[in-house]
Amino acid sequence: MRINPTTSDPEVSIREKKNLGRIAQIIGPVLDVAFPPGKMPNIYNALVVKGRDTLGQEINVTCEVQQLLGNNRVRAVAMSATEGLKRGMDVVDMGSPLSVPVGGATLGRIFNVLGEPVDNLGPVDTRTTSPIHKSAPAFIELDTKLSIFETGIKVVDLLAPYRRGGKIGLFGGAGVGKTVLIMELINNIAKAHGGVSVFGGVGERTREGNDLYMEMKESGVINEQNLAESKVALVYGQMNEPPGARMRVGLTALTMAEYFRDVNEQDVLLFIDNIFRFVQAGSEVSALLGRMPSAVGYQPTLSTEMGSLQERITSTKKGSITSIQAVYVPADDLTDPAPATTFAHLDATTVLSRGLAAKGIYPAVDPLDSTSTMLQPRIVGEEHYETAQQVKQTLQRYKELQDIIAILGLDELSEEDRLTVARARKIERFLSQPFFVAEVFTGSPGKYVGLAETIRGFKLILSGEFDSLPEQAFYLVGNIDEATAKATNLEMESKLKK
């Protein structure tokens, strides 16, 4: 009796159940795959190519279906390098979009776009997974209440407050403290809100990703001894990855964040560094798929792609995802379609200033350039709004007087202007504060300052109550009581020296 090969061979029986196609064409990171008639995969389905290259090395490439071409062919974008692939190789249709691990098992770990751990710390529990392509929450699920997301960082909470479930753009060059600010926010959301964070490294330098991981371990944001106590999950798709991976890594990070929001009902911080690279990767893929380019060579689907990512970042009645996105501005041109499309989605901008960093004022957030749609009396209340406006006016006047001071000196100013300058310098220093994550380097303990304390402190400085105190007393302290205590200590020290 002859044995039926299709039932005896386990490999064949698996393929019978799964949809099987063959590679018809390879154009860099884009594959055309032919399937049997009537067995076409859906758009966004994951396809897996397994086999061996000419040297006998194992190949395992995952792709995502982007177009149905007709003649039983689909065009797919690879999520990893396509070296070693050949025409005629078997391709398995997984029957669903890419799915990644979600939940507590992801904390303290580094993943790639496919949700595979890349930190050499062993496998991750994959019993709970979620597809990366989803619709945004329905209107009925959204939380429409406007509320401030308190960060415990004075300059942010007072002058450019974040919205709970909002989107914030983080602008700043190299070396002005972007990473430290990101780490402090991750630390504070865990302590004050019982929340977790997800960091999506989209198309940035591998070295920076590694540095961030090392710094997080050093500062305790990632707990190596007990990973479950870590406060962040990391997802990296760096510069050396194919455009498909860079285009989808933001969605992988967002999917992990959505689980914490919808199932664990937590407040989540989602960091995307850098949102421009997401657009850039989409532009590369668009050209490879043969779409006609739009303005400045960008993809014609730019607004749609950006919208499908940004609309999933929101507050629901269960929890919230507050997103902080680093924005690279090509050639400092804010009218470029990529940053211009991003701005349409932002609720607040935090601008880091090299001038403040050079003065040693950290966080180096520019109080005059940073903006927020939340800074309105009906949202934050009259007291907060008035205090913020007075702080900005005082700092603006100081900025205008700086040229005169540089040429003629302080003595040539009127009495009123001299008082404004003295208060502005105190405000500038009081906007600095010691960070928890920088304790390891500075030796001074970090401070979390509540919004009410922040407003009280600045009101007292503006009222002139502390005009007699030295400005040094306001530098790197938490609330105003610490500034007065520091002033007393400075006075004692100067008396002892005499």
Curated annotation (Swiss-Prot):
It is found in: Plastid, Chloroplast thylakoid membrane. Keywords: ATP synthesis, ATP-binding, CF(1), Chloroplast, Hydrogen ion transport, Ion transport, Membrane, Nucleotide-binding, Phosphoprotein, Plastid, Thylakoid, Translocase, Transport. The modification Phosphothreonine is found at residue 6. InterPro entries: AAA+_ATPase (IPR003593), ATP-synt_VA_C (IPR055190), ATP_synth_F1_bsu (IPR005722), ATPase_a/bsu_AS (IPR020003), ATPase_alpha/beta_chains (IPR050053), ATPase_F1/V1/A1_a/bsu_N (IPR004100), ATPase_F1/V1/A1_a/bsu_N_sf (IPR036121), ATPase_F1/V1/A1_a/bsu_nucl-bd (IPR000194). One of its GO terms (molecular function) is ATP binding. GO terms for biological process: proton motive force-driven mitochondrial ATP synthesis. Gene3D superfamilies: 2.40.10.170, Bovine Mitochondrial F1-atpase, Atp Synthase Beta Chain, Chain D, domain 3, P-loop containing nucleotide triphosphate hydrolases. Pfam families: ATP-synt_ab (PF00006), ATP-synt_ab_N (PF02874), ATP-synt_VA_C (PF22919). It is an enzyme of class 7 (translocase). The modification Phosphoserine is found at residue 13. Disulfide bonds: none annotated. It is a peripheral membrane protein. It catalyses: ATP + H2O + 4 H(+)(in) = ADP + phosphate + 5 H(+)(out). ATP binds at residues 172-179. SUPFAM superfamilies: C-terminal domain of alpha and beta subunits of F1 ATP synthase, N-terminal domain of alpha and beta subunits of F1 ATP synthase, P-loop containing nucleoside triphosphate hydrolases. Its EC number is 7.1.2.2. One of its GO terms (cellular component) is proton-transporting ATP synthase complex. PANTHER family: ATP SYNTHASE (PTHR15184), ATP SYNTHASE SUBUNIT BETA, MITOCHONDRIAL (PTHR15184:SF71). F-type ATPases have 2 components, CF(1) - the catalytic core - and CF(0) - the membrane proton channel. CF(1) has five subunits: alpha(3), beta(3), gamma(1), delta(1), epsilon(1). CF(0) has four main subunits: a(1), b(1), b'(1) and c(9-12). Produces ATP from ADP in the presence of a proton gradient across the membrane. The catalytic sites are hosted primarily by the beta subunits. Belongs to the ATPase alpha/beta chains family. This is ATP synthase subunit beta, chloroplastic. It comes from Draba nemorosa (Woodland whitlowgrass). The gene is atpB.
